């Protein structure tokens, strides 16, 4: 290391080193004459200064979950066709942060269940739900998913997904349009924003 004079640092006297460091400190002091705003000045005011964002950890976590839902698809019947249609370019599911439907429930936090659920398939729905990490949400799509639909009185059909797993949002219709499913996803987003993570 050398000084501006070109003299190696090892050949400098202590006075020369002190003068050099003093010059660095003085130039630093002259460049930093304006203090940063005292938090006491703006914390109690209406608006924080530009560039300062005040929030809670809970809101940041909910915000990140809101925009990065990873869905797993459990399509059983005709409603699944509308779900696939919703993922196409016309409705652009990517703007909600849901670009890719997950292949494994262990990577998903939203399960979209669409179609007619039979009692024979119900244990598999429960197993997939149990494999999802917390926090997790379930969206029941279609008349069959919400109440059993046309097949409600059949001996083999479950009269609604809520008989097997807890459901957060119901989407009525036979089959529901992609717009209705997008509205349900926005309802899930509202639920996520209100989720309490930290226990008091």
UniProtKB/Swiss-Prot annotation:
Protein name: NADH-quinone oxidoreductase subunit B
Bilayer disposition of the protein: Peripheral membrane protein
Domain of life: Bacteria
Named cofactor requirement(s): [4Fe-4S] cluster
Family named by the database record: Belongs to the complex I 20 kDa subunit family.
Principal localisation: membrane
One GO biological process term: electron transport coupled proton transport
Keywords: 4Fe-4S, Cell membrane, Iron, Iron-sulfur, Membrane, Metal-binding, NAD, Quinone, Translocase, Transport, Ubiquinone
Pfam families, A to Z: Oxidored_q6
Molecular function terms, GO-annotated: 4 iron, 4 sulfur cluster binding; iron ion binding; NADH dehydrogenase (ubiquinone) activity; NADH:ubiquinone reductase (non-electrogenic) activity; quinone binding
This protein's GO CC annotations: plasma membrane; respiratory chain complex I
EC number(s) stated in the UniProt entry for this protein: 7.1.1.-
Quaternary structure annotation from Swiss-Prot or TrEMBL: NDH-1 is composed of 14 different subunits. Subunits NuoB, C, D, E, F, and G constitute the peripheral sector of the complex.
Gene that specifies this protein: nuoB
Binding site for [4Fe-4S] cluster: 78-79, 144, 174
Class of this enzyme: translocase
NCBIfam families named in the record: nuoB_fam, PRK06411.1
């Amino acid at each position: 290391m050398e000084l501006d004079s070109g003299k190696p640092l090892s050949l400098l006297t202590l006075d020369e080193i002190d003068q050099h460091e003093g010059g660095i400190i003085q130039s630093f002091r002259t460049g930093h004459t304006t203090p940063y705003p005292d938090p006491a000045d703006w914390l109690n005011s209406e608006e924080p200064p530009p560039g300062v964002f005040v929030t809670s950890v809970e809101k940041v976590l909910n915000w990140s979950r809101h925009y990065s839902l990873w869905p797993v698809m459990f399509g059983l019947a005709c409603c699944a066709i509308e779900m696939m249609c919703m993922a196409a370019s016309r409705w652009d599911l990517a703007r909600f942060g849901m670009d890719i439907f997950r292949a494994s429930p262990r990577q998903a936090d939203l399960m979209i269940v669409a179609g007619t659920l039979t009692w024979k398939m119900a244990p598999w729905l429960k197993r997939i739900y149990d494999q999802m990490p917390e926090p997790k949400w379930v969206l029941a799509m279609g008349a069959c998913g919400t109440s059993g639909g046309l097949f409600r009185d059949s001996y083999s059909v479950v009269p609604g997904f809520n008989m097997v797993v807890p459901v957060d949002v119901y989407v009525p219709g036979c089959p529901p349009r992609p717009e209705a499913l997008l509205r349900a996803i926005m309802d899930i987003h509202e639920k996520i924003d209100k989720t309490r993570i930290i226990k008091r």
